[in-house]
UniProtKB/Swiss-Prot annotation:
The protein's name: NAD(P)H-dependent D-xylose reductase
A single GO BP: D-xylose catabolic process
SUPFAM superfamilies: NAD(P)-linked oxidoreductase
Gene behind this protein: XYL1
Gene3D superfamilies: NADP-dependent oxidoreductase domain
Role description: Reduces D-xylose into xylitol.
Amino acid sequence: MTYLAETVTLNNGEKMPLVGLGCWKMPNDVCADQIYEAIKIGYRLFDGAQDYANEKEVGQGVNRAIKEGLVKREDLVVVSKLWNSFHHPDNVPRALERTLSDLQLDYVDIFYIHFPLAFKPVPFDEKYPPGFYTGKEDEAKGHIEEEQVPLLDTWRALEKLVDQGKIKSLGISNFSGALIQDLLRGARIKPVALQIEHHPYLTQERLIKYVKNAGIQVVAYSSFGPVSFLELENKKALNTPTLFEHDTIKSIASKHKVTPQQVLLRWATQNGIAIIPKSSKKERLLDNLRINDALTLTDDELKQISGLNQNIRFNDPWEWLDNEFPTFI
């Protein structure tokens, strides 16, 4: 028996589950099986990206489930993200074709701009996904070379791919309010979603209010805060107390007889924010999927959790190598 998460209707009429499975840091050797098992449990939203280096495996899991009749393609919301190296209008369609080829799908449901940053492109056969790599000389210097491509040029190239039926919906990720405002002034096709780092240490309430008023769905990543970044040896994360052990979170969890993880996820969904937590355990996967049935936080509890905000951002391009990208300044 499968359990299907509550859905939200996006500004273009498409539906998206409020709870999905994040594919970031999902190991290649188990990724296909985890996607397949998640579909059996009831997951329908899969949040991937070119930069996660596992789109082939995501596609294998998806296509196995479709082939076996567990699900129809139109029932799934398969997400990818345009990496920074492919912002030039000539490279946008090539990058999407690479994603579709890796996924072995005819279209993606949501295609985000991963960051509002344009890197100097490198050929697929030199390095893919390229990550921070913009050439051997740059790599030797610990440097990322930028490419001078306005965001609106990238967006218009993406809009053409929507027209061609290769993308159903467009999204933006890691954008500031001012950038979103500027994009909306020139966009023909409105983004359906904004994906941001979001947890009680970084609540971004003003940005979320603006985006919601603009009719754009907010999707949270790294809902557990510093835990997501510990294995990356992120100094800020290593020096920040875990939310799982915070007295406020533990107290609320104890009151509702749930885990601290469930409190953090429900705080997001109860505020209308979609979540994409990752887990390799079937029990936890189902708990995450059924989070809205597990508990309802009081208004006071919601305020207590939001009151933990310290504006701590763990994923900040200002700290990438030597570049100091001003994405969130």
